[in-house]
Design a protein with these regions (language model features):
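Residue patterns forming the tRNA-binding/recognition surfaces of aminoacyl-tRNA synthetases
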Residues: 1-14, 25-27, 33-35, 75, ...
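Protease-associated
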Residues: 17, 24-118, 127-131
Length: 172
């Protein structure tokens, strides 16, 4: 698992990549127990400098299993958060973000000032995301109509206004 950062949860169904800072150190942390019980037993990736900021989520004594420079992580593919676009049919239609989609990419705007050091990328909804994803040949996934309503491509939130969907996306 990677603890990714976003200020716009409604864009998560359109996630196409995760950006890291190429010179930031990241840790793979094994969570023994956490206060919520959600991550116990999991291994999560987070910027090393931010481990103390996530003590509640990572538990009292998380174990660092490995460390990596961000540049070492670039190119690693991951299973998408949502499966809406990860089907053979969607790929054939060109609706998926392409062969480089759902991978870790480098971006100079990723910092450890806030967040987790891993930044969610939805190129249809952010200029930085768009330019960075274009550099890696990652296509745009746009399941929102002109009125800001989720289309049928995102069945769980179909017909919902994007800001109304935020709380449901966060709960998922």
């Amino acid at each position: 698992l990677a603890l990714i950062w976003t200020t716009t949860p409604w864009t998560l169904p359109s996630n196409s990549a995760v950006a890291v800072g190429p010179e930031i150190e990241y840790s793979l942390v094994e969570v023994a127990s956490d206060h919520e019980g959600n991550l116990a037993g999991e291994r999560v990736l987070i910027a090393t400098d931010l481990i103390p900021a996530y003590a509640k989520e990572l538990g009292e004594e998380p174990t660092v299993v490995a460390t990596y420079e961000g540049a070492e992580l670039v190119g690693i593919h991951y299973h998408p958060i949502y499966d809406y676009f990860d089907t053979p049919e969607r790929r054939a239609e060109g609706a998926a973000p392409g062969p480089n989609g759902w991978s870790i990419i480098a971006a100079d705007y990723v910092t450890t000032t806030d967040g987790t050091g891993l930044v969610h990328q939805a190129p249809a909804f952010g200029e930085d995301d768009m330019w960075t994803c274009m550099e890696y040949g990652i296509g745009v996934v746009l399941p929102v109509d002109e009125g800001g309503v989720f289309t049928s491509e995102v069945s769980d939130y179909e017909g919902m206004q994007i800001f109304d969907a935020n709380r449901y996306v966060v709960a998922d």
